[in-house]
Swiss-Prot record:
<keyword id="KW-0378">Hydrolase</keyword>
<dbReference type="Pfam" id="PF02633">
    <property type="entry name" value="Creatininase"/>
</dbReference>
<feature type="binding site">
    <location>
        <position position="31"/>
    </location>
    <ligand>
        <name>Fe cation 1</name>
    </ligand>
</feature>
<comment type="pathway">
    <text>Cofactor biosynthesis; coenzyme F420 biosynthesis.</text>
</comment>
<dbReference type="InterPro" id="IPR003785">
    <property type="entry name" value="Creatininase/forma_Hydrolase"/>
</dbReference>
<dbReference type="GO" id="GO:0008198">
    <property type="term" value="F:ferrous iron binding"/>
</dbReference>
<keyword id="KW-0479">Metal-binding</keyword>
<feature type="binding site">
    <location>
        <position position="33"/>
    </location>
    <ligand>
        <name>Fe cation 2</name>
    </ligand>
</feature>
<comment type="function">
    <text>Catalyzes the hydrolysis of the formamide of 2-amino-5-formylamino-6-ribosylamino-4(3H)-pyrimidinone 5'-monophosphate (FAPy) to form 2,5-diamino-6-ribosylamino-4(3H)-pyrimidinone 5'-phosphate (APy).</text>
</comment>
<feature type="binding site">
    <location>
        <position position="42"/>
    </location>
    <ligand>
        <name>Fe cation 1</name>
    </ligand>
</feature>
<dbReference type="InterPro" id="IPR024901">
    <property type="entry name" value="FAPy_deformylase"/>
</dbReference>
<dbReference type="GO" id="GO:0043729">
    <property type="term" value="F:2-amino-5-formylamino-6-(5-phosphoribosylamino)pyrimidin-4(3H)-one formate-lyase activity"/>
</dbReference>
<feature type="binding site">
    <location>
        <position position="110"/>
    </location>
    <ligand>
        <name>Fe cation 1</name>
    </ligand>
</feature>
<comment type="similarity">
    <text>Belongs to the creatininase superfamily. FAPy deformylase family.</text>
</comment>
<comment type="pathway">
    <text>Cofactor biosynthesis; riboflavin biosynthesis.</text>
</comment>
<dbReference type="InterPro" id="IPR024087">
    <property type="entry name" value="Creatininase-like_sf"/>
</dbReference>
<dbReference type="GO" id="GO:0052645">
    <property type="term" value="P:F420-0 metabolic process"/>
</dbReference>
Amino acid sequence: MDKMELRYNSGNILNEEVHKIGIIALGSFLENHGSALPIDTDAKIASYIGLNVSILTGAKFLGVVIPSTEYSYVKHGIHNSPNEVVEYIKIMIEHSKKIGINKFLIINCHGGNTLIKDLISELNDKKTSVILENVCFTHAAFEEIAIGYAVGILSEDKMKTHSFKTYPEIGMIGLTEARLKNTDIDNEAKILEEKGAIFLDKNYGKTLLKNLINNHVEIVKKMSEGDSNVGRLPITRL
């Protein structure tokens, strides 16, 4: 059988090297986010960013990781072990290698998944590059509300009841064990308590989403050019 020659230069792509880059979305599917955001908020935001970056660059969107993990003391959803998450990613990587992909950008939008950082670094070798980029904000608070609106998963009607006084997972204000065991969580919760009610800033959400997409486009561009010095630009927070 004659070898099929593919037109790697076709379409709207940065360059032919993007065909060696795969984008993986990582979030969580079963996690409470108050009343205005769905339980799979993190997975949907990560997928939205990843797919749009793929469209704008030509890199391949490989899909979303099903399992997710979390710190044992953060109790607001159903999660898996770090090893289960990484094993799933390994399967995605192995199948992707068969279609010529050897560079992987994982866009993670769930704080608990930062636990896999060291395990992910072990997947790198001379032939494979795996980069984990974390986009994590205070849980179900200002940033997630804003970006949720921009993505289209926020219920504006349910914002009326989206309060940390009712839903303890918002800002993790009511998650006592998590606040006692993690100073970062406690500090973010204190900031939210001081601000009081959560409000929706639609313009901020649109700007935040645009910046996140553009930032990851730049990361893919650097990856396609062989630049190992990639990283996320600082995001202005409310």
